[in-house]
């Protein structure tokens, strides 16, 4: 209930609270991202609905780590809601294109099916321009089932947040 959490996260005049969107960067034999945040495709009006602070974005964070979008080899999706998958694509000449030009994207097939066939309760969270262009570009490796998808990286369907949300386990 709001009475419990509002002392720690007071809402603004539009009843929004400050939230962070964190991607996970893994560096080793490959350079990987788990999720990519909301991206930069939303209009100022759309971003304002959620109160997104666009002063710093994923490109800034990659640059701070000495990287660019071209350095990412693998992107793994926990699920395809816009605040996790919005950064998978960027606009180029009015078309959504893969944001990470040298990456393969690992997406759970059943999550993709749900995202491309949303129902009344979840359609506001799935935006096709975040993932359909990846399939069209041939850069998606669909995940079927649970287990290791790369050496030291396993995925497990947990459901809950979305029907096919997955946990990503990292072992090193």
Model-based region annotation:
Residues 1-64, 167-172:
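Conserved beta-strand hairpin/beta-sheet module of binuclear metal-dependent hydrolase folds
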Residues 32-34, 76, 105:
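Residue-level marker for buried hydrophobic side chains located in beta-strands
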Residues 86-95:
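Metal-dependent catalytic neighborhoods of phosphoester/phosphodiester hydrolases
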Residues 38, 82, 164:
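Short active-site segment of divalent metal-dependent hydrolases/proteases
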Residues 53-67, 71-83, 99-157, 162:
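Metallo-beta-lactamase
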Residues 35, 79, 161:
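Conserved G/P- and acidic residue-centered "switch" motifs that form tight phosphate/ATP-binding loops
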Residues 17, 98-99:
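Extracellular/periplasmic catalytic domains that process cell-envelope and extracellular macromolecules
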